[in-house]
From Swiss-Prot:
GO terms for cellular component: mitochondrion; nucleus. Interacts with IMMT/mitofilin. Residues 27-58 are annotated as: Disordered. It is found in: Mitochondrion; Nucleus. Increases neural cell metabolic activity and mitochondrial oxygen consumption rate. This is Protein SHMOOSE. Residues 35-45 have a biased composition (Low complexity). Residues 46-58 have a biased composition (Pro residues). The lineage of its organism: Eukaryota, Metazoa, Chordata, Craniata, Vertebrata. It comes from the Eukaryota.
Amino acid sequence: MPPCLTTWLSQLLKDNSYPLVLGPKNFGATPNKSNNHAHYYNHPNPDFPNSPHPYHPR
């Protein structure tokens, strides 16, 4: 495996901000998950359609 690809993969796993890459199990699986995407799904904004949400993937 080329070293640049290894670095990219290790950075993906360290960053933990790519739940689509890591798999669907990261989406709000447990309330104490420490990534922003899980936080967004576990603490939805009641005014979501009318106000911007800090974790909305846009």
